[in-house]
Curated annotation (Swiss-Prot):
Name of the protein this chain belongs to: Small integral membrane protein 17
Region ranges (Disordered): 1-84
Keyword Membrane: yes
Record's compositionally biased regions (Basic and acidic residues): 13-42
Keyword RNA-binding set for record: no
Disulfide bonds: none
Recorded name of the encoding gene: SMIM17
Chief location category: membrane
Transmembrane segments annotated in the record for this chain: 96-116
One term under GO cellular component: membrane
UniProt keywords, alphabetically: Membrane, Transmembrane, Transmembrane helix
Subcellular localization: Membrane
Membrane topology: Single-pass membrane protein
Length: 118
């Protein structure tokens, strides 16, 4: 077993003093918060009109997003009017492979190879 230095054994025996063994920069929780993070949150109404440039940017982004959503919904409706949805081939192939594997295992486990040994 590895021998411990006296300060390490002291830390094991007295856990409340382990704080003194840590280097200063590793105790990040004791540091004051970063000055940029001290700004408090503000409550803003969604429909409120204001003269701040940040909120104008947000409202223009929101209208852009709503236009994108409306175009996506229109696309969904046009596909629904055709009456069918084109599925990819992967689920069908997976189902076929699964059925073949299950059939093969069933035949092997029930003794199909024994039929060839006359």
């Amino acid at each position: 077993m590895q021998s411990l230095r006296p300060e390490q054994t002291r830390g094991l025996l007295e856990p409340e003093r382990t704080k003194t063994l840590l280097p200063r920069e590793s105790r990040a929780w004791e540091k004051p918060p970063h000055p940029a993070c001290t700004k408090d949150w503000e409550a803003v109404e969604v429909g409120a009109s204001s003269h701040d440039s940040d909120e104008k940017d947000l409202s223009s982004q929101e209208t852009g997003l709503s236009q994108e959503w409306s175009s996506v919904e229109e696309d969904d409706e046009s596909e629904g009017s055709q009456g069918f949805v084109e599925w990819s081939k992967a689920p069908q192939q997976t189902t076929i492979v699964l059925v073949v594997c299950v059939l093969f295992l069933f035949l092997v486990l029930t003794g199909m190879p024994m039929m060839f040994h006359i």
